[in-house]
UniProtKB/Swiss-Prot annotation:
GO BP field: isoleucine biosynthetic process; L-valine biosynthetic process
Description of how the protein assembles with itself and partners: Homodimer.
Protein known as: Dihydroxy-acid dehydratase
Reactions listed under catalytic activity: (2R)-2,3-dihydroxy-3-methylbutanoate = 3-methyl-2-oxobutanoate + H2O; (2R,3R)-2,3-dihydroxy-3-methylpentanoate = (S)-3-methyl-2-oxopentanoate + H2O
Cofactor(s) this protein requires: [2Fe-2S] cluster; Mg(2+)
Family of this protein: Belongs to the IlvD/Edd family.
Keyword Heme attached: no
Residues that, per the record, bind Mg(2+): D81, D123, K124, E491
Alphabetized UniProt keyword annotations: 2Fe-2S, Amino-acid biosynthesis, Branched-chain amino acid biosynthesis, Iron, Iron-sulfur, Lyase, Magnesium, Metal-binding
Modified sites of kind N6-carboxylysine: K124
CC annotations in GO: cytosol
Biological pathway: Amino-acid biosynthesis; L-isoleucine biosynthesis; L-isoleucine from 2-oxobutanoate: step 3/4; Amino-acid biosynthesis; L-valine biosynthesis; L-valine from pyruvate: step 3/4
EC number annotated for this UniProt entry: 4.2.1.9
Gene that this sequence comes from: ilvD
Length: 611
């Protein structure tokens, strides 16, 4: 049996000094020999998805101690992508994922912790902690802070649901008065929690359920609802049990790499495609798979995207549907249940809470179980009161939405689309692939051709859109915004939002080697690989070149002959692969270090040390 890692610092005469320091943290004689569980929190007052986590780490810690473990809490950083959006702050968002993963590794290995409870929530925090968990491969349970309630505003004599993106779009739309913009702004983000749509944070927290590393309801139970407290309480007890099974019973089945296998990654990506999750999840799943030493690639994502239907459409794809509605329809277990019915999942694999996913679905899928407890759990409703306090309300819907024909979650037979919610496109513009969230693309523009309007940065693209330089039929092309070229692979939420503000959301396309917020919609194609800074063809496109986009056939093509491209490449090689215009962008040493090691988006934008 493997010895408890913590014995390195708690046992033996020579560890008297270490034990003395442990005693100074509150440990007693009887605590030495118990599993030491790291409570990996991410509380910060900068981020609404994390502002309520301050006391939740200690809630988990108390449950760990009542179950016979020793809990030690620390915090990671957390960047709010919405606040960092639209300025140089966004350069730090994706690199923060690596910093979070490293900081968890540093703390857990430096202090020889035996297991972890990861309390995450927003965009890069869940992926960073997931990467660390698979890197360390010690028992872990994920429990996130939960989704925000959707904003609501009385608009033209009816109640309209809102989120962050509505505020951004309205602010740039001259049809809205200042008073209307203020009304939307004040109502868009009413509570603590991760932004209310199927954006990156909620997408990733949902995927932890499919990976088997979190409890049912983790992705969809509102941050404000009292039911969410149970997830934190159970996580504290569960992690002690998992630690004992591994260290005292030699049960390797509880380890993250035994749970998050290749099949589990397939399940997670299948879920992502079915619910139209954020394109950022592609980056994060590819990165996490590499930490787990699993050969899960863009080719696998492409394969899955061709056979998985869209079973759930959530904001930004459908503005009236938010995470609170997904939970009301049975949450992630409800979507997984329909995917299982369609034969699209591997359910023989374990989870942290169940012997197999199949057994978990039999108990937690509201269309399969008569359990009063399960139906009550998924009836949790928004409270409708602005608050930053977790578990502060207990409102419920009268009954769960089990309509799989016209409800929020559909069966395969009644799918929103038989074609998946994410697609990988290939062609001479993206030889290693690029990603589009098809769930957010209007059917009228699934095939699109138009002239490229070239911008060497997100900033110049924003100015071009707001100044009326983009016309219907144009393709906005933003380059040198990839992992190396940015550096940091900025999100392009402002350009996509401003296209919508100008009435061009269904009349234009946007292509970039950067990435998109989970809040982006429209014909937005990102992660173009190789990126311009790596010598990708996107760096050879010139103003007015025609680009053909064919989502049904998964193709993207620059209509320029090979000989001309070869001439342009020779010219660019001589000039250097850098933006044609000077960018006023301060690149710190920290960002330069990330850029020096960053790999392509097709590899998850992870770091790679020089050979």
């Amino acid at each position: 049996m493997p010895p408890y890692r913590s014995r390195t610092t708690t046992h033996g005469r020579n560890m008297a000094g270490a034990r003395g320091l442990w005693r100074a943290t509150g440990m007693k004689d009887e605590d030495f020999g118990k599993p030491i569980i790291a409570v990996v929190n991410s509380f910060t007052q900068f981020v609404p998805g994390h502002v309520h986590l301050k006391d939740l780490g200690q809630l988990v810690a108390r449950e760990i101690e009542s179950a016979g473990g020793v809990a030690k809490e620390f915090n990671t950083i957390a960047v709010d992508d919405g606040i960092a959006m639209g300025h140089d702050g966004m350069l730090y968002s994706l690199p923060s994922r690596e910093l979070i993963a490293d900081s968890v590794e540093y703390m857990v290995n430096a202090h020889c912790a035996d297991a972890m409870v990861c309390i995450s929530n927003c965009d890069k925090i869940t992926p960073g902690m997931l990467m660390a968990a698979l890197r360390l491969n010690i028992p872990v349970v994920f429990v996130s802070g939960g989704p925000m309630e959707a904003g609501k505003v009385v608009w033209e004599d009816s109640v309209k649901k809102l989120d962050l993106v509505d505020a951004m779009v309205a602010a740039a739309d001259d049809h809205y008065t200042d008073e209307q913009v203020k009304a939307i702004e004040r109502s868009a983000c009413p509570t603590c929690g991760s932004c209310s749509g199927m954006f990156t944070a909620n997408s990733m927290n949902c995927l932890t359920e499919a990976l088997g590393l979190s409890l049912p309801g983790n992705g969809s139970t509102l941050a404000t609802h009292a039911d969410r407290k149970r997830l934190f309480v159970e996580a504290g007890h569960l992690i002690v049990d998992l630690a004992r099974r591994y260290y005292e019973q030699d049960d390797e089945s509880v380890l993250p790499r035994s749970i998050a296998t290749f099949s589990a990654f397939e399940n997670a990506m299948t879920l992502d495609i079915a619910m139209g999750g954020s394109t950022n999840t592609v980056l994060h799943l590819l990165a996490a798979a590499q930490e787990a030493e699993i050969d899960f690639t863009m080719a696998d994502i492409d394969r899955l995207s061709r056979r998985v239907p869209v079973l759930c459409k959530v904001a930004p794809a459908v503005s009236s549907v938010h995470m609170e509605d997904v939970h009301h329809a049975g949450g992630i277990m409800g979507i997984l249940g329909q995917l299982d019915n369609a034969g699209l999942l591997t359910t023989s694999i374990p989870t942290v809470h169940s012997e197999t996913l199949a057994k978990a679905l039999d108990h937690w899928d509201v269309t399969r179980t008569n359990s009063e407890m399960v139906h009550k759990f998924y009836s949790a409703a928004p409270g409708g009161v602005p608050t930053q306090v977790a578990f502060s309300q207990e409102r419920r819907f009268d009954k769960v939405d089990t309509d799989r024909e016209k409800g929020v979650i559909r069966s395969k037979e009644h799918a929103f689309s038989q074609d998946g919610g994410l697609a990988v496109l290939y062609g001479n513009l993206a030889e290693d692939g690029c990603i589009v969230k098809t769930a957010g693309v209007d059917d009228s523009i699934l095939k699109f051709s138009g002239p490229a309007r070239i911008f060497e940065s997100q900033d110049s693209a924003v100015l071009g859109i707001l100044n009326g330089k983009i016309k219907p039929g144009d393709i906005v092309l933003i380059r040198y915004e990839g992992p190396r070229g940015g550096p940091g692979m900025q999100e392009m939420l402002y350009p996509t939002s401003y296209l919508k503000s100008k009435g061009l959301g269904k009349a234009c396309a946007l292509i970039t080697d950067g990435r998109f917020s989970g809040g982006s919609s429209g014909l937005s194609i990102g992660h173009v690989s190789p990126e311009a800074a790596e010598g990708g063809t996107i760096g050879l496109v010139r103003e007015g070149d025609i680009i053909d986009i064919d989502i049904p056939n998964r193709k993207i093509h620059l209509a320029v002959d090979d000989a001309t491209l070869a001439e342009r490449r020779a010219e660019q090689d001589a000039a250097g692969w850098k933006p044609a215009e000077e960018r006023k962008r301060k690149i710190s040493t920290a960002l330069k270090a990330y850029a020096a090691m960053a790999t392509s988006a097709a590899r998850g934008a992870v770091r790679k040390l020089p050979d």
